[in-house]
């Protein structure tokens, strides 16, 4: 309940991921937890958060990975021990299998944004744990359902912020964003000195008038 309340009050994506990891560590007897997120369709799912600051996040899961495809098609978390007997597992590259086996993966869960798989949670087994607890599957499912809604809201907010700061025609940052940055820099340098240089491009306005704003 505390997790649900806290996560619904923030639109900060990193905070949502950190809180999701924290509640899983508190409620389950597991090893390490990793979260991989996809920035854009077609791109790989890259490591962005973990329960340990020193854990290596320099890894990724390709969108074509059969395990990723399984998570896209299913709502429930994946029990890795059972998944090893599936057709999807057998169709994975040996390198992909080795990477997951080396981490002692025990569960994988999807973070959904509607029909899109926005992210993946990898949960590894604790070294002293002898068996899986299937009640944990339901717990993981409940946590990821709440986290998925929060992530969707955070991504929508981030998209709205980017659109508000970007010129629709040129794709460049607009005057509103310029004033935001100017205000931030002024606040950071209130006790010091700050200089602003404006550069004018010769005949730029004329070029826009002749060939159009998009071309300019």
Residue spans for each PLM region:
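Conserved nucleotide-binding and Mg2+-coordinating catalytic segments in signaling enzymes
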Residues: 5, 158-180, 199-215
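Helix-loop-beta substructure at the N-terminus of cytosolic sensory domains
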Residues: 9-46, 65
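Acidic/proline- and glycine-rich, intrinsically disordered low-complexity segments
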Residues: 54-88
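Signal-transducing coupling segments at domain and membrane junctions
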Residues: 81-105
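Regulatory loop-to-helix N-cap segments in sensory/regulatory domains
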Residues: 101, 124-141
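A short, aliphatic-rich beta-strand micro-motif
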Residues: 104-112
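Sensory-domain boundary capping and coupling elements
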Residues: 111-126, 150
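Allosteric cytosolic regulatory segments
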Residues: 141-148
């Amino acid at each position: 309940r505390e997790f649900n309340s806290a996560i619904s009050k923030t639109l900060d994506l990193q905070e949502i991921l950190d809180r999701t990891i924290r509640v899983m560590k508190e409620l389950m007897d597991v090893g390490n937890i990793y979260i991989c997120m996809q920035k854009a369709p077609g791109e790989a799912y890259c490591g962005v958060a973990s329960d340990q600051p020193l854990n290596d996040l320099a890894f990724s899961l390709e969108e074509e990975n059969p395990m990723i495809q399984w998570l896209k098609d299913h709502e429930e978390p994946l029990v890795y021990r059972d998944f090893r007997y599936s057709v999807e597992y057998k169709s994975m590259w040996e390198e992909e299998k080795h990477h997951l086996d080396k981490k002692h993966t025990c569960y994988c869960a999807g973070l959904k944004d509607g029909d899109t798989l926005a992210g993946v949670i990898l949960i590894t087994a604790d070294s002293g744990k002898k068996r899986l607890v299937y009640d944990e599957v339901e717990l993981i499912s409940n946590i990821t359902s709440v986290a998925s809604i929060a992530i969707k809201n955070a991504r929508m907010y981030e998209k709205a912020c980017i659109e508000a700061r970007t010129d629709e025609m040129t794709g460049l940052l607009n005057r509103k964003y310029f004033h935001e940055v100017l205000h931030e820099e002024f606040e950071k340098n209130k006790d010091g000195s700050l200089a602003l240089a404006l550069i004018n491009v010769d005949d730029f306005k004329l070029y826009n008038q002749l060939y159009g704003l998009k071309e300019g």
